[in-house]
């Protein structure tokens, strides 16, 4: 058979690279490949921010958010941000012992995961938020416009922000509270608490393991649900991770008070700083969460 009789080969529909919007919006026909059965994922962003959008199947309010983000420039991309350069970055030292200053280093990207559930949405490990809540209108409008919401902007304006949007059909699961074993002293009905069976405290089930938990807020910390709230992840020096809820007008000192109330008797000689590179020390205790750009951020405890 001559080369003129050969039919042109059908282009492959590889999902590995970035596609144009015409490729993404093309409806699948009878001859479409089988890999188009799953939900499409789109990535939008630039030098300073990025967003991955997974196209859902149901038509509802969340559909509108995903579709508008796609229409404003979303393209298919990976869920995680591209890996940073593996080249050495650090401080040089001459043979004479003097340090050589290095150039400006690109801050690490800040990643936020927004999950849309059937009963609302969550940001990272924060509380469930309602789609019809007027307080969330500005946040959702930024998502529709493929923009980084203001409350997710990092303290370091040079740091790129990657916002991953995910869709789950089930309801957001309720958080399980940590069960604490009883460690008191038993007392018999006769009034005597002597004896090996009642005088010794009950041993815990196992050694304490730092887990993510949310202790009761301090007496001085009052959350006003009528004004904007935010969740801040606190990574303590012992490895424990706490997620605390604050109002935007709360201060850095209120964050310290929350940590101190969760660790009574612990040393108070520590410093708080934002996560990122370079880390930003939070030395002004009167600075509000909004002023410091700490909404939905991660704060580290350092001794």
Curated annotation (Swiss-Prot):
Occurrences of domain UBX (ranges): 225-302
One GO cellular component term noted in the UniProt record for this chain: cytosol
Residue(s) carrying Phosphoserine: 181
Gene3D superfamilies referenced in this protein's UniProt entry, alphabetically: Phosphatidylinositol 3-kinase Catalytic Subunit, Chain A, domain 1, SEP domain
Keywords: Phosphoprotein, Ubl conjugation pathway
Xref: InterPro entries: NSFL1C_SEP_dom_sf, SEP_domain, Ubiquitin-like_domsf, UBX_dom
Any one GO molecular-function label of the UniProt entry: ATPase binding
Source species, domain of life: Eukaryota
Keyword Phosphoprotein among UniProt keywords: yes
Domain SEP: 109-173
Annotated spans, Disordered: 1-107, 170-220
Assembly information from the UniProt record: Interacts with CDC48A via its UBX domain.
PANTHER family, alphabetized: PLANT UBX DOMAIN-CONTAINING PROTEIN 4, UBX DOMAIN CONTAINING PROTEIN
Protein name in UniProt: Plant UBX domain-containing protein 4
Source organism per UniProt: Arabidopsis thaliana (Mouse-ear cress)
């Amino acid at each position: 058979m001559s080369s003129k009789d050969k039919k042109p080969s059908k282009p492959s529909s590889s999902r590995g690279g970035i596609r144009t919007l015409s490729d993404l919006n093309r409806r699948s026909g009878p001859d479409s490949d089988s890999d188009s059965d799953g939900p499409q994922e789109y990535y939008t962003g630039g030098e300073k921010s990025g967003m991955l959008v997974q196209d859902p199947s149901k038509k509802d309010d969340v559909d509108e958010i995903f579709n508008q983000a796609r229409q404003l420039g979303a393209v298919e991309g990976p869920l995680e941000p591209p890996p940073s350069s593996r080249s050495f970055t650090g401080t040089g030292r001459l043979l004479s012992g003097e340090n050589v200053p290095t150039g400006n280093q690109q801050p690490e990207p800040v990643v936020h995961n927004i999950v849309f559930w059937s009963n609302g949405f969550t940001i990272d490990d924060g509380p469930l938020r309602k789609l019809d809540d007027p307080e969330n209108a500005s946040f959702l409008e930024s998502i529709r416009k493929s923009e980084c919401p203001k409350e997710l902007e990092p303290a370091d304006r040079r740091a790129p922000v990657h916002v991953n949007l995910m869709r789950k059909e089930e309801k957001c699961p309720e958080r399980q509270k940590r069960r604490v074993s009883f460690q008191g002293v038993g007392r018999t009905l006769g009034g005597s608490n002597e004896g090996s069976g009642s005088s010794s405290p009950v041993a815990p089930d196992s050694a304490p393991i730092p887990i993510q938990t949310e202790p009761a807020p301090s007496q001085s910390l009052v959350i006003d649900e009528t004004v904007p709230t935010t969740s801040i992840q606190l990574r303590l020096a012992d490895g424990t991770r706490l997620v605390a809820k604050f109002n935007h007008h709360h201060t850095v000192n209120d964050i310290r008070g929350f940590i101190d109330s969760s660790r009574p008797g612990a040393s108070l000689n520590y410093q708080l700083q934002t996560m990122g590179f370079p880390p930003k020390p939070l030395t002004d205790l009167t600075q509000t969460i909004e002023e410091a750009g700490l909404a939905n951020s991660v704060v580290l405890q350092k001794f």
